[in-house]
Amino acid sequence: MPTCFVGEKTDLRLMKNQLSWTLPTILVLVGGLLLTTGVTSAPAQNTSPKRVLVVSTTTGFRHSSIPTAEKIIGELAKQSGAFTVDYARVEPNDPQFKGADGKPDAAKVKAAITEVLAKKMSVAALKNLDAVIFANTTGNLPLPDPQAFLDWIKTGKGFAGMHSATDTFPGFPPYIEMIGGEFKTHGAQVEVTAINQDAQCPACRHLPANWTVFDEIYQLKNFDRNKVHGLLTLDKHPNDKSPGDYPIAWIKEYGQGRVFYTSLGHREDVWDAQWKDGKGERKNSPAIAEAYQQHILGGIKWALGLEKGDARPQTAVQ
């Protein structure tokens, strides 16, 4: 019969107690090591959708594609589940604005725009938003406080602009600084092949190295490539094909905020894969419209901080 000494029993108890607290400690340490080395699942994120305001009011030229833009952005929000949308919009052709001559009464339309923006873009209202989208806005919009809006973006909010967002607040340097450029002119609508400058960015990673699209291509002023991260560009004039640098889309940081802009979006068939004109024709295939939708969805999600992307300025076309 084996002999068991009291000291051995004590040692066994001690070892058992040590193991009882050492094992959890080891697990915690290993877990911490995995976190620091990235060998773990993605951290849990707030699953609540972001809140986005789509602004489509205009005091200048009004694009016929605005209703299509509003619809597509709403569909992208619903399909992605990443964000919800509210709208700041006024349709000038609404019967309530009809004047004695049967045309929209400019004073009534302006008053309605002012009222809508006062409600949707007040300092108090902005506090409840994560991003604002300017969908083909034009002219000097009667915001309650334009500078407060820009300051709001700087605090870490998002901004996305499509097409004529650069033809908004013309001659207002703070806004132009925020968005990154200002509309100068455009030629006839034309087919162009855009160079994809960043295939890793969520706004461009689904696009080929050279992407062909038919649209109205803006030429810009007050644009500095050293202050933006280029996404899409042309290396020749869209119409006369002379060599040059013609930016189409970019992202940039603005304070702590994030800004995405694309000059594409003039035509309905750029936005909507199902759209057809009165003759049942379209210049852009459904596939191009679907690619454009992913382009703006990626840009919006980047602006919301939901997708990663390098926003460091580039000094030359890649």
Predicted feature locations:
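Solvent-exposed loop/turn segments at secondary-structure junctions
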Residues: 58-61, 91-94, 137-141, 159, ...
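Glycine-rich, highly charged phosphate/nucleotide-binding loops
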Residues: 94, 100-125
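A glycine-rich, often tryptophan-bearing local segment used as a flexible ligand/cofactor-contacting loop or short
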Residues: 125, 134, 138-206
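Catalytic beta-strand/loop cores that center a nucleophilic Ser/Cys/Thr
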Residues: 84, 117, 128, 181, ...
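Extracellular ligand-binding/catalytic regions of CAZymes and related secreted enzymes
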Residues: 45-50, 56, 64-67, 71-80, ...
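Structural recognition of the beta-strand scaffold that forms the well-ordered cores
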Residues: 53-55, 85-87, 130-135, 153, ...
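Bacterial N-terminal signal peptides
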Residues: 24-38
